Amino acid sequence: MEIYGFTLSEVGRFTDLKFQLAPTPTHTSNVTVFVGNNGAGKTTLLKSLATSLSWLVARIRTEKGSGNHLAAEEIQNGASSALMVITVFDDSQAWSSIPDADPDDDLFTWGIARTRQGRKSTVHSSLTDVSRLAEHYRKELTADDKASLPLIAYYPVERSVLEIPLKIKTKHTFDQLDGYDNSLNRGVDFRRFFEWFREREDSENETGISDTALAEISIKFGYDSDVWKTLSNLKASSRDRQLTAVRSAIAAFMPGFTNLRVQRKPRLHMAIDKDGVTLNVAQLSQGEKSMMALVGDIARRLAMMNQSLDNPLHGDGIVLIDEVDLHLHPKWQRSLIRQLGETFPNCQFVLTTHSPLVISDAKDVLVYVLNDGELHEHNGLYGLDANQVLLEVMDTDIRNSDVQKRLNALLERLQDGDLETAQKLFAELAEELPDGHIELAKAALLLRKLELRRA
């Protein structure tokens, strides 16, 4: 399942906006990224996509389910009505395998409309196709209670890593449909993640050997003993497939982090090994917890919704993430899109970012620059350094504007052969800028050449 196209009419800043999402004929990646200044409308786009998709989730759950509605405050100022229309491509239907089938049979289009009170309606909601698509998945689930469902999730900028609970007061079920719980309105929920993880691990330990027991055996007999090797192999064979998916996803995004687990001594908590050192998850940095919670939540939902797949991370889905670079170290920002595609290869990702590192290190990513209510596709970003992306795509100076003006003035004086003024400007900048400043080092070479010519 993929979002094929989207239209916004009189919604927020957008009077009439139409766009496609990757993959497209010219962008084979499954990732689309929106960039733009604060207030440009990036969040409005993602929230509108989430609102449209909420109707599919609601009608997969129940035949007459209702999704989220357009709010009155989302209607553009001065307009009477607003409309959002989404087209989804889904080839999981039985007729998709028929040789002469119409390709349009795989496209489903529905619209959500809202009119201000006291105004005459000029647009109307249309929900026939979303009901038809949802009915297909309900039939699949009726015929096979292990049938896979598509993940649909939205992680807003307000997502936060909540306090990890020590006790679970009420138990929940975790079947395929539960993968949709709060998937479009809450973001990361460590409480539900902890509850799910503990339940799965309890089941895993009942059929295998706990990590605690294995650790005690290693202390007594050693890692090279036949006893430890036999029990370790037995544990590996009894690993829970869903937990394995979550652990492997976190390890892929966070090198050096392994063996996520629940520990019960000295008190109940989630633990993880970081570079061989066991830590309480609560001890991790905000960036580490944010990454773990985001990746863990996506993997958990995929695992729940694809129980019959050998690798649940290969499940189908659509994931929307606002400000995907939030709290992340630049090193993780640079590899983020590549890891999303490699770890979750059948999910379509729609992201927003303020980071040049996110969009300059992945091939075939579809990048839209948002400005004054309009979208402009920007190609050829792969391999550009962060400064080029800042200047060419994000319309931001690569350094302090005053410093840049003075560097430009220095280079102009050097080109004009004005040695005295150039020496003065260079001395002033050398006093303020750190040793090893690249542009100043280049200017120093040019200044030395000019001095030698004048000697």
Regions found by a protein language model. Give the residues of each.
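Switch/communication elements of ASCE P-loop NTPase nucleotide-binding domains
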Residues: M1-E63, N259, R264-I398
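P-loop NTPase switch/coupling surface
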Residues: M1-N205, L414, P434-A455
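RecA-like P-loop NTPase motor core
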Residues: E2, L141-A143, R338-E342, L357-A455
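Hydrophobic, Leu/Ile/Phe/Ala-enriched alpha-helical segments that form helix-helix packing faces
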Residues: L49, L53, A134-D144, V246-M254, ...
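Amphipathic alpha-helical surface "interface" segments used
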Residues: L70-E73, F108-G111, E216-D226, H269-D275, ...
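A structural signal for well-ordered alpha-helical scaffolds and beta->alpha junctions
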Residues: V130, A134, S148, F190, ...
